[in-house]
Amino acid sequence: MALININYESKTLGMPVMINAIIPQGRGSYKTLYLLHGMGGDYTTWITKSRVADYVDNTDIAVIMISGDNKCYVDNVHGRKYFTFLTEELIETCTNWFGLSCDRKDRYIAGMSMGGYGAVHAALIKPDEYG
């Protein structure tokens, strides 16, 4: 298992984005869990305040964690498009970078508090993206 910290420029958000990724060892199309933090958290919250790395160690599940910047993971009319970033750009980017499975049955989304809202919202609006 590798814990990878990435800083890259998001086209959708028009700003740098920090990502933590837990990637299994080996090769292949990994199942993927997009894990969203709650209000006041950031892309490091799940790593520093939970045992997520222990839970997925020795599995074929990759975990992707981003910062929601307390914006509830929705597109803002007069602001940034976090929902579009989460459900389109992030999936495409991480799938290409890490060799994640393209099959919706292998892609999951979850969160707590604000992240739980973002996860349910994404799963309901884009059911074709998540298994």
Regions found by a protein language model. Give the residues of each.
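Non-catalytic cap/lid and distal C-terminal segments of serine-dependent acyl enzymes
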Residues: 1-131
